[in-house]
Amino acid sequence: MEATKKLNGKAVGKWLSNNAIIMMMLAITLIVGIIHPNFFSGTNMINLFKNVSIRYIIALGISGCLITTGNDLSAGRLAGFAACLACIFAQTEGASGKFYPNMPTLSTPVVFILVIAICAIVGLCNGLVVSYLKVQPFIATLGMQQVVYGICLVYTGGTPIGSLNKNFTSLASNTIIGVPVLIWIALIVAGCFWFLYNKTRHGK
C-alpha cells in the first residue's frame, strides 16, 4: 500500500513538473477571470484565440526545432518577411504604389503558395547551415534573423503596403460557423503537426 502511494505521489509530481507552465497559465487565467468576470465572455474568448492563432502557428513551426534540442531565432523575423511578401503579392492590379505594376491580381491560394515556397527556402538554408556546416542553431538562426530583417527593409524600403485584394484581407474578418477563419487555419495546422509527430516515422 505504501509503495503504491509513493508511486502515485511520484507520478503526480512528475506530471506537475512536466506541465508546470500549463498549470501556471491556468491559474493566471482563473485569477484574471475572477478579477474581471467579462474575461470569460464568448466575445473575449474568440478575440483572444484569434489573436493567439498566428503565434500558435509560429510556435508549432518552432516546436520541431525544440524537440530536437535546437532553436530558431529567425522565426519572428521570417513571419514579418512573409507578411510583407504576402501583402506585395496581394496588391490589386493598377493600385498606386504597386511594387510590381505589371503583375496581375493574384488569388489568395497563389499568394499563400508563393510565400510558403520562399519562406521554405529560407528554412532550408537554416537547415543546411546547421546540418552541413555544423553551425550551432542559435548562431545560425540569429544570423538569418538579421539577414531576413535586412532583406525585408531593403525590399520594401520601409514603406506601407496598401491596396490589397479584398479576398486576402477578408481572412482576418471572415468566420465559419461563428468562428474566425484564422482560428480554423490554426486548428488545421495543429492537426497536421499532430499527425506528423504521432503517426509518421519522421515524427516519432
PLM feature segments, named:
Residues 31-35, 39-93, 128-135:
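Single transmembrane alpha-helix segments in multi-pass membrane proteins
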Residues 94-145:
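Alpha-helical transmembrane segments within multi-pass membrane transporters and channels
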Residues 2-59, 95-110:
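Membrane-interfacial amphipathic/re-entrant helices at transmembrane-helix boundaries
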Residues 21-34, 62, 87, 116-119, ...:
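Hydrophobic core segments of alpha-helical transmembrane domains in multi-pass membrane transport
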Residues 64, 88, 121-132, 155, ...:
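Membrane-interface helix caps of multi-pass small-molecule transporters
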Residues 19-23, 48, 55, 77-81, ...:
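Hydrophobic alpha-helical transmembrane segments
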Residues 64-67, 95-103, 156-166:
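A cytosolic-side transmembrane-helix exit/cap motif
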Residues 133, 137-202:
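Transmembrane helix-bundle core of multi-pass membrane transporters
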